[in-house]
Amino acid sequence: MDLLQILYDAYNTPWLYILIAFGYAVLVALVLPIPIEIALLLPLIDGRWGYLASIGLAIAAGKTLGAWLIFWLGLNLEGSVRKWSERWRVARWFVARAERLVGKTGYTGLYLLLSVPMMSDTIPIYVYSLFNEEGRALERNMFLIANFLAAINRVAILSMAFVIGANLIHV
């Protein structure tokens, strides 16, 4: 059974659908390199805006939980990554550039990257967590707020694009 079938079967049981969307969002943040928008298709097509808002909040909460786990992991692994990177010039160069990117773009860069519909969240979350200059470039709570708000923004962008596209087709 694939994810689409699981979502389709659970769609008319809102608490189950929302729970699946939450769990899926955690996995998308942690390991799945696929977009979360799959969970939004059915309520968008049906025009169930209240249901869509509930699913959007569940997705934002799930992605935030996943981001918190990755942030914690990043704080614990960053020293090892830095030590390892000192052995090879290319790795040292990459780590320095990644730290500079995170330091320069900060919360705004993270928010903008995570707001892009159909983009994988996994890589930006890991980059901003692992190359956080020992937790000095990004503070945990603001990192989590940026993740949550970007997830909400992403649902809003997708919803607006869907409504505009649907209206253009009916014109």
Task: Label every model-predicted segment.
Residues A39-G47:
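Short amphipathic helix-loop junctions that connect adjacent transmembrane helices
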Residues M1-G23, G47-V171:
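Membrane-interfacial helix-loop-helix
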Residues L16-E37:
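Hydrophobic transmembrane alpha-helices
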Residues P33-P35, P43, P124:
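Proline-rich intrinsically disordered, low-complexity coils
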